[in-house]
């Protein structure tokens, strides 16, 4: 039995090494600068302050889609009285004009994009406030058609600036009730990681197709992430990593503040799945951390190694016994 203890220690060592190494994964085609492959389609997203020279913009034939900012938080007030009266009335009127002009620009860009064969999508920037009112605001503003993509944008975890994840659950459920489709989720890595780690708490958010904002040349080791085997859309260019001197991809007719996205598929393939609307399959919740189990098994208090039934010499004075004999670290050499 000396070999038993040595084998146990060896197994513990091997399992510990494997646990620390984690899963081994290869770098898939969509993880390393997929925008450099001319077959992969590109998508531009913009808001009202991004300037676009459309004649030049439409010359880039890799651009397959355009996603525009639609609504932002709760709807604007139609009245500049009451809470808006007094010194803020001029500001209120200015904000309302900005809102009206932004909505008209949204509608104009949609007409231009779809007339020129681009796929169209719209996003709502989630803010603090009633999520059902925000969902209704988005639907009233964007008026999404069956062939258009819908997006909920959660820019971070700070609930003083952005919609909480609990409210986001309510938002997407209400969109589903009113349209028959779920939106996809736009967010950054930290928020996506948190949702994935708490997918039992956020069963809807964690199963929405992921529009992933990450400004690095690759996403090796990121996926699978919870229910997400990969991204649906990868935002790889923004003002954070694009300047006059250096930019991963430049779209003609735009400035360095434009957002550019890639999908690991052709324009034809993208068009077939563009409207989205379904939830991803739910994966089983993770088992307890292997390293914790190993710590308990290999580093815990001294435990019996094994219990065996020891055959004894049976005589009239020593009847057979069924009581197990414990073999432990103190007496294993006796056996």
Regions found by a protein language model. Give the residues of each.
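Catalytic domains of cell-wall/extracellular-matrix polysaccharide-remodeling enzymes
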Residues: 149-224
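Solvent-exposed loop/turn segments at secondary-structure junctions
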Residues: 47-52, 70-75, 125-131, 155-160, ...
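Structural recognition of the beta-strand scaffold that forms the well-ordered cores
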Residues: 41-45, 64-69, 119-124, 148-154, ...
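Bacterial N-terminal signal peptides
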Residues: 11-22
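N-terminal carbohydrate-binding/catalytic regions of secreted carbohydrate-active enzymes
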Residues: 37-121
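Bacterial N-terminal signal peptides that target proteins for export
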Residues: 2-11
């Amino acid at each position: 039995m000396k070999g038993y203890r040595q084998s146990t220690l060896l197994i513990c060592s091997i399992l510990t090494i494997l646990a620390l190494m984690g899963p081994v994964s290869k770098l898939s085609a969509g993880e390393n600068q997929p925008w450099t492959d001319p077959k992969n389609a590109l998508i531009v997203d913009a808001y009202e302050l991004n300037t676009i020279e459309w004649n030049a913009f439409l010359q880039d034939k890799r651009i397959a889609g355009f996603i525009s900012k639609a609504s932002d938080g709760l709807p604007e007030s139609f009245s500049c009285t009451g809470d808006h009266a007094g010194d803020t009335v001029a500001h209120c009127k200015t904000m309302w004009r900005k809102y009206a002009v932004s909505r008209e620009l949204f509608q104009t860009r949609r007409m231009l994009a779809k007339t020129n064969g681009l796929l169209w999508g719209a996003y709502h920037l989630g803010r603090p406030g009633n999520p059902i009112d925000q969902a209704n605001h988005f639907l009233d503003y964007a008026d999404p058609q069956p062939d258009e993509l819908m997006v909920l944008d959660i820019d971070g975890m700070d609930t003083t600036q952005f919609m909480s994840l609990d409210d986001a659950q309510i938002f997407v459920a209400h969109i589903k009730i009113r349209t028959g489709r779920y939106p996809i989720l736009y967010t950054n890595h930290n928020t996506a990681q948190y949702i994935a780690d708490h997918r039992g708490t956020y069963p809807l958010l964690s199963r929405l197709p992921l529009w992933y904002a990450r400004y690095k040349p690759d996403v090796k080791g990121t996926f699978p992430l919870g229910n997400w085997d990969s991204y649906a859309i990868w935002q790889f260019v923004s003002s954070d990593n694009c300047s006059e001197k250096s930019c991963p991809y430049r779209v003609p007719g735009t400035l360095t503040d434009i957002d550019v996205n890639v999908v690991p598929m052709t324009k034809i393939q993208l068009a077939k799945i563009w409207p989205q609307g379904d939830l991803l399959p739910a994966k089983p919740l993770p088992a307890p951390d292997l390293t914790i189990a190993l710590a308990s098994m290999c580093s815990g208090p001294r435990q019996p190694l094994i219990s065996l039934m020891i055959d004894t010499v049976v005589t009239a004075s020593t009847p057979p016994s069924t009581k197990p004999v414990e073999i432990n670290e103190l007496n294993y050499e006796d056996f």
